[in-house]
Amino acid sequence: MNHYPEDPLRILAVAETWQGSNAYAFVRSFRRAGHSVSLLADEWFAASGWQSRPMKAARRLLWPMILREATDAAQREAKQFRPHLFFVFKGIMVSPQAIRAVQAGGGIAINFWPDTSFVDHGKTAAQALPCYDWIFTTKTFGPADLQARFGITNASFLPHGFDPETHKPTAMDRSDATLYGCDASFIGTWSPKKEKLLVALMSALPSLNLKIWGSQWERAGPSLRAYIQRRPIFGAEYAKAIGAAKVNIAILFEGNANAVSGDRLTSRSFHIPASGGFMLHERSDEIAAHFAEDRDCAMFGNPEELADKVRFFLAHDEARNRIAQEGRSRALSSGYSIDDRARTVIDKARALLAARQETVAPSVASTFQLAPSEQASVGPPAASDT
């Protein structure tokens, strides 16, 4: 029996809420589609801004209490809001008890896991993974890794996407052009591989106007310090930086010791072309499956090719601009937006709810009927969109 194939769902979502967050993009997409979303924001329980050593130490000491607060809040919302879907983006503070509270009321729990490793983000997240009704992973190797590590088979690959509200060509004034304009940019968190490639690029093209945006670049050696902007950029500023750079370099994260593979596709793979930027992407079979080389983006496979491609496209404005336009068209026409990804999540939730409804008693199934007056989200006042 179909489970309300057209009716909006009640969704309890765990996500960060800063503008430009991949997690918050899902929340806004669900709301645009007419679903009722109650939000449990990660930052309500553990402030990510606590970056100094004393504050990090305090957070470690408080962590058991933070987890208890997060679990209590989820259990409370499960009882009061009665969600059809518990949507968790990563969920480092989501416990098995929180998931079971939703499932006990007949709801479905779905996780969207964006990282290469399932075991490097705390014990709570790893313990919770087997409890979900379904896991979407942005890595093609993710389902096999979940089965090998946890015996989980209810998982599938779902790539990142672009947020149509954020990742789009964005108007800039002169100060924006001064701040973000450059020959080439890299936007992303530091890693040894990324540093090595950018050092090689600057050795080959020492006069290149390069700008590096992102976190942890203070760990880089002295040869890149002149190019590091010493801060991450988010939301509209991120889109501006993409649009202002002549060449946007997309380097894949190599993964860490506990990951079975490094990235083959990332969120930036979609953000850059959707924002109207020219993308020079590290070559992989997965990026090639989404964007055609030399039509929708350019690609490189080693430091020498990276330098050669940067040099070539800086000298060929027409080719660079044509590829940027084709890349945006490809992103818009190929189902790469967060709205498309969110529809996949909703379709899976409906299928799981329908399967569950066939096995539950009518008295339990009836708790899912949406009253006509149920329009607003249930939750703390801070959950409202601004």
Where are these regions (language model features)?
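Conserved acidic donor-binding segment of nucleotide-sugar-dependent glycosyltransferases
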Residues: C297-P303, F313-D317
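Proline-aspartate-enriched helix->loop->beta-strand connector
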Residues: A78-F86
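Nucleotide-sugar donor-binding catalytic core of glycosyltransferases
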Residues: N2-K56, L67-A73, F89-K90, P96, ...
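Active-site proximal beta-strand in glycosyltransferases
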Residues: A101-T116, W134
